[in-house]
Curated annotation (Swiss-Prot):
Binding of (6S)-5-formyl-5,6,7,8-tetrahydrofolate, residues: R20, E85, R124, K459
Organism whose genome encodes this protein: Bacillus pumilus (strain SAFR-032)
Subunit structure: Homodimer. Heterotetramer of two MnmE and two MnmG subunits.
Major site of localization recorded for this protein: cytoplasm
A Gene Ontology biological process term: tRNA wobble uridine modification
Designated name of the protein: tRNA modification GTPase MnmE
Comment on bound cofactor: Binds 1 potassium ion per subunit.
Pfam families listed in its UniProt record: MMR_HSR1, MnmE_helical, TrmE_N
Keyword entries, A-Z: Cytoplasm, GTP-binding, Hydrolase, Magnesium, Metal-binding, Nucleotide-binding, Potassium, tRNA processing
Record function comment: Exhibits a very high intrinsic GTPase hydrolysis rate. Involved in the addition of a carboxymethylaminomethyl (cmnm) group at the wobble position (U34) of certain tRNAs, forming tRNA-cmnm(5)s(2)U34.
Amino acid sequence: MDTIAAISTPMGEGAIAIIRLSGPEAVQIADRMYKGPKEKKLVSVDSHTIHYGHIVDARTDQVIEEVMVSVLRAPKTFTREDVIEINCHGGIVTVNKVLQLALREGARLAEPGEFTKRAFLNGRIDLSQAEAVMDLIRAKTDRAMNVAITQMEGRLSGLVQRLRGEILETLAHIEVNIDYPEYDDVEEMTHRVLVEKATSVKKEIESLLSTSHQGKILREGLSTVIIGRPNVGKSSLLNSLVQETKAIVTDIPGTTRDVIEEYVNVRGVPLRLVDTAGIRETEDIVERIGVERSRQVLKEADLILLVLNYSEELSEEDIKLFEAVSGMDIIVIVNKTDLEPKLDVEKVKQLAKDRPVVTTSLLQEKGIDELEMAIQSLFFTGSIESGDLTYVSNTRHIALLQAAKQSIEDALEGIEMDVPIDIVQIDLTRCWEQLGEIIGDAVHESLIDQLFSQFCLGK
């Protein structure tokens, strides 16, 4: 493999920036750029050491930057290759000069995610662990971060490998029974034993899949739409949850003319919170565009926060909103409880059916805690911070687990129908292969390229 280089820290001004190199010539390339005290040579220093010096353009003898250089030799590195990390002052011009010098000395500019890709290809991590690196970078809450870390540490990989081991052991047992029926040393794979083993695998796959809904919420955020008639307090609710003024809050109905989106951490649940223009008929062209966008995001929502006005009677428009979100996960928020009551709350509870109804006075900052608790309890039972569960959050993993579950169910159905054992063997083998794809066993190269292309440059 050639040697790659990239800036591993965000571009812009900052205290420190890092340029990373990885590959067989990483140390030699850095050595040609580096000038240390007492003629120190990086090619001669020990692994996992850091060295003060300067980056110098050998052609002009110009000092480019004062640096600290980390030397990390294979195989005890992230990529299992020789790795150099040049720590310099943050700044667009200086950092790019150091990178350009590394490229001139023989490195190639890394592709997005190529360092992590090399870690995978060199056996340092499996594919699910590699994907967890990006999940960690993109985590919006502490819990999402913890889920990514447990996956990086190999908890999901370990479970998948154990399941594959159980299936492989069963397949080997079947193979011996088929090819060497005369062997008395090997116990016969009876109908009962085969059902027990396949059922055990199925239950474990189902257990993993049972965490997928919550896992996807933690990974991607809960698409949450705030709806209600104009001027019931939708934008005030958004601002209360975000805790800063993002939407325009006035007494004029219809002020929010577009869709406003913001990520919010609610008791460990990441909400992709959307405040919409009121869904109503309007002659205003700009407002009408906002209303149409509101209808679209409503269809795609995971959670609806339906806001009502405590100081006004329930209107036909309110009832239509209840009808529009029928069958969806909703929390009804009765706002403006600081004003004179006119709303029939019992009627609201009837319309809400068994969905939560929370009373608030956003002006007086009352009811927000109760709303946050309602959101958490709607999607997570017990403490969301529990580290006992292995959450499956990646869409690719979920699809493969669902396919593996179908394969094991096909095997069980075949056993019950008393089909030939070699047919059952095909279904078990397919299940084994599908589980293997989660950790990157026998994955097509184009899929690997596509997955790592989503990473940021320098990772």
